[in-house]
């Protein structure tokens, strides 16, 4: 897989890089998480902004015909880092359990490292699939409900929380199956 600077400097990739940089103010804002509700709203607003940039970068990449190998790496990496920052900080504050954080981190780490392995073997980056995107969306909803301080015992919170756990496991299994299929196809060529 060969990339050049034109492959990197696209509108959609720059939006993904912006999302990467949002991790810093998100991390820092959590230092004052318990000081006021205003901080919750700032974190919430940055999370919504990150979600909007995620939607926009994919839309613009397709619309402007700027789908690049670099973008296939940067976009999910930005998603994983931004999500990890928020979930790590929420777990550190006791707002989300550490096993939930562990599930997300282990899944994302295996998918990332597996993606590097598959890319090296087949010579191209596997794009994200709909199940992975849906999983990030559901985890994002759990994060937003947590930031809005929705009661953890409420039906609304529990539906999204337990559904996200199911999605984390299913999307991991789907990624393993998909990677294996690509590797098997490569052996047949």
Outline where the language-model segments fall:
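Alpha-helical transmembrane bundles and membrane-interface segments of multipass inner-membrane proteins
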Residues: 1-189
């Amino acid at each position: 897989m060969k990339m050049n600077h034109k492959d990197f400097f696209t509108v959609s990739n720059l939006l993904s890089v912006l999302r990467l940089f949002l991790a810093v103010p998100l991390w820092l804002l959590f230092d004052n998480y318990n000081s006021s509700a205003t901080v919750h709203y700032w974190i919430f607003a940055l999370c919504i902004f990150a979600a909007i940039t995620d939607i926009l970068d994919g839309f613009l990449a397709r619309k402007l015909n700027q789908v690049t190998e670099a973008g296939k790496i940067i976009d999910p990496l930005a998603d994983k880092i931004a999500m990890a920052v928020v979930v790590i900080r929420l777990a550190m504050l006791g707002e989300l359990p550490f096993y939930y954080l562990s599930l997300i981190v282990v899944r994302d780490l295996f998918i990332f490292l597996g993606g590097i392995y598959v890319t090296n073997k087949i010579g191209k980056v596997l794009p994200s699939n709909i199940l992975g995107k849906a999983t990030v969306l559901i985890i994002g909803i759990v994060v937003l409900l947590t930031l809005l301080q929705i009661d953890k015992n409420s039906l609304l919170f529990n539906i999204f929380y337990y559904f996200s756990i199911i999605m984390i496991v299913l999307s991991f299994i789907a990624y393993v199956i998909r990677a294996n299929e690509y590797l098997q196809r490569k052996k047949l060529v």
